[in-house]
């Protein structure tokens, strides 16, 4: 019995930016999806009972089902994030009913324009209890939809864009061999391990607030702290302009 497979971990190639497949991000190939199903059958046969082995999968780009961890809200909702590409024009926040405590949505989910049925394939294969992705550096939520956990880990370094320094980190997984489905996961963040600030907070600030399109601008304006800051700057500028006009008026009056 000691030679039996208790649980498995798989990595799938989501193929990045693949213009041969779509106008947007690529998707796992049909061969990769078939492999994810076939390997479960093979492990079940090796174990002798044909039962699906509890398994967790990892890949870079999330499938469209990650949007099912969100709830659509009006565009004026504070901290709402506008969807990307196929989901553009719709605004979302985390669905707290399906997401674990501590989950964060920091940016749009950057998935492929096409749904190739990967999540459904994992369900059909049996045994898969979670799929975790990266790609969207500011996201760190874990939600349970379609009978499977869908989750993120944020960026952990400082050579690329991401959230505030204290929110960058790695995701730790703890599995029990006798029940891997009831796993425990948590983030080990820079704020917890090192401190709140990095050695280059100016760069981190720019990366956190940098926008490259209208969607990014709208998302920034939904962040209350950004709105308050802009209102404060606007108030100071209006006060300064009013003071200058008053001085100019007095000069003409003389």
Name these PLM-found stretches:
Residues 5-6, 64-68, 139-142, 159-160:
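Short catalytic/ligand-binding loop motif for oxyanion handling, primarily in non-cytosolic enzymes
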Residues 227-249:
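Hydrophobic alpha-helical topogenic segments used for membrane insertion/localization
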Residues 103-110, 116-125, 137-222:
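Binuclear metal-dependent phosphoesterase catalytic core
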Residues 9, 54-58, 129-133, 142, ...:
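Structural recognition of the beta-strand scaffold that forms the well-ordered cores
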Residues 1-2, 12-15, 59-62, 134-137, ...:
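Active-site-proximal beta-strand/loop segments in catalytic clefts of secreted hydrolases
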Residues 8, 67-72, 164, 198-200:
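Short aromatic-enriched loop/helix-cap "lid" or pocket-rim segments at secondary-structure transitions
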Residues 16-136:
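His/acidic metal-ligating clusters that form di-metal
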Residues 133-140, 239:
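Extracellular low-complexity, Gly/Ser/Thr-rich intrinsically disordered linkers
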């Amino acid at each position: 019995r000691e030679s039996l497979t208790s649980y498995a971990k798989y990595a799938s190639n989501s193929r990045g930016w693949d213009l041969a497949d779509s106008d947007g991000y690529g998707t796992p190939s049909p061969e990769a999806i078939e492999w994810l199903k076939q390997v479960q059958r093979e492990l079940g046969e090796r174990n002798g009972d044909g039962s699906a082995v509890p398994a967790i999968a990892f890949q870079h780009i999330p499938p469209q089902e990650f949007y099912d961890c969100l709830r659509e809200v009006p565009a004026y909702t504070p901290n709402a994030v506008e969807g990307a590409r196929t989901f553009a024009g719709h605004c979302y926040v985390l669905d707290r009913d399906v997401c674990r405590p501590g989950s964060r949505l920091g940016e749009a989910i950057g998935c492929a324009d096409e749904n190739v049925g990967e999540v459904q394939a994992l369900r059909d294969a049996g045994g898969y209890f979670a799929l975790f992705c990266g790609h969207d550096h500011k996201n760190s939520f874990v939600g349970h939809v379609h009978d499977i956990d869908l989750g993120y880990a944020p960026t952990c370094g400082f050579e690329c864009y991401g959230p505030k320094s204290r929110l960058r980190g790695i995701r730790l997984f703890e599995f029990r061999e006798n029940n891997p489905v009831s796993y425990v996961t948590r983030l080990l963040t820079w704020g917890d391990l090192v401190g709140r600030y990095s050695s280059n907070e100016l760069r981190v600030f720019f990366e956190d607030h940098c926008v490259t399109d209208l969607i990014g601008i709208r998302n920034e304006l939904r962040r209350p702290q950004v709105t308050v800051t802009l209102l404060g700057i606007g108030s100071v500028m209006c006060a300064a302009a009013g003071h200058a006009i008053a001085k100019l008026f007095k000069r003409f009056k003389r």
